[in-house]
Regions:
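Auxiliary Fe-S-binding modules of radical SAM enzymes
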Residues: 2-14, 18-23, 213, 221-324
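Core AdoMet radical
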Residues: 51-71, 75-98, 113-126, 142-169, ...
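Acidic (Asp/Glu)-rich catalytic clusters
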Residues: 75-77, 104-112, 132-142, 174-178
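Conserved C-terminal portion of the radical SAM core fold
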Residues: 167-227, 245-268
């Protein structure tokens, strides 16, 4: 990556695969999670409320095809020639019997204008028979599997009730990428118990994995979640980046320690105002990106600037990660 480019952005990445504008359409295909249904735990992740990212057209009583058609109507007025990626986003989209999964994925691909799939899932929910199916599907359509990593610390993963370990992440990402499938990750910055240094060290750890893309966003406290209750009882356990500029500087430090080839899809997330407790910056996503780019220019920062330094500093322990 040229140092004239501050970071690898997702739209540029997509242009390598498509000669036209492409938009993801989020889907709720009616799945659950193993840490919700009792297989690995109850109640789900302590921070999770799926209402925060499900558009109005995402309703489980609607078929996958119906949700896609309604999503197309939502976007088509701006770009009539746009094509779409079916984004299986809500909950764990590989957590079902293989034949049922195949029906849903293939239903999505039959919708006019859909040119590929993005499948969001957990690192502990990629059985071998499904991976073999996806490997074959990948030969015929655009496909990305996006893993919810959230943290590289097992201690944090236990605290937020994820029900998997970082070793599960390493194995799943390596297995998926080895099949030639584009493999993405998602992490949250600001989870309770994590410091600036441990979060930045995490960037070096993720850079060791064969990830194609990475989504980053700030911890958001959402009404009705267990984490919101924990915050009410012990607010000192949380550092919520009340000022957006503090979070921007953390993101820059993080990005400087990432592998220079990794594609960065997102830096921030916006939850509905009626659900959000904190942080409430009042900054739209595009405004955040503008401020981030300005600050990176001021600091002379770019993705991977300190990547090799990260490799030397990261120590991975069984229950947590630290820096030298």
């Amino acid at each position: 990556m040229s140092h004239q480019i501050q970071y690898n952005d997702f739209p540029t990445f997509l242009r390598k695969y498509f000669p036209y504008k492409v938009q993801k359409i989020s889907l709720n295909a009616g799945f659950t999670c193993p840490n919700r249904d009792g297989t690995k735990g109850w109640g789900g992740c302590t921070y999770c409320n799926n209402q925060t990212f499900n558009p109005d057209y995402c309703r489980t009583e609607k078929s996958v095809a119906t949700q896609l058609e309604e999503g197309k109507c939502f976007f088509a007025h701006k770009y009539p020639e746009m094509k779409y990626l079916a984004y299986f986003q809500a909950y764990t989209n590989t957590y079902a019997e293989l034949e049922g999964l195949k029906r849903k994925y293939e239903e999505a691909l039959q919708v006019d204008g859909v040119v590929g799939l993005v499948i969001g899932t957990r690192p502990d929910c990629m059985p071998e028979d499904l991976l073999r199916y996806l490997e074959e599907l990948n030969k015929h359509t655009f496909l990305m599997v996006e893993y919810g990593i959230e943290s590289a610390s097992d201690e944090t993963l236990r605290r937020i009730n994820r029900g998997h370990t970082y070793a599960d992440t390493v194995e799943a990402v390596q297995r998926t990428a080895a099949c030639g499938i584009l493999t993405g990750g998602h992490i949250i910055l600001g989870l309770p118990g994590e410091t600036h240094d441990t979060m930045v060290a995490q960037a070096g750890m993720l850079s060791e994995l064969p990830l194609s893309t990475l989504k980053i966003h700030q911890l958001q406290l959402i009404r009705g979640t267990r984490m919101a209750h924990e915050y009410e009882e012990n607010p000192a356990d949380f550092h919520l980046f009340k000022e957006v500029d503090e979070y921007i500087d953390l993101v820059i430090d993080y990005v400087e320690h990432l592998h220079p080839d990794l594609v960065l899809e997102r830096f921030v997330s916006q939850s509905p105002k009626e659900l959000l407790i904190a942080p409430d910056w009042g900054v739209k996503n595009y405004e955040f990106v503008t401020r981030l780019q300005k600050r990176m220019k001021e600091r002379g920062a770019y993705q991977g600037k300190k990547y090799r330094d990260s490799e030397k500093r990261v120590i991975f322990a069984e229950d947590n990660f630290t820096t030298e």
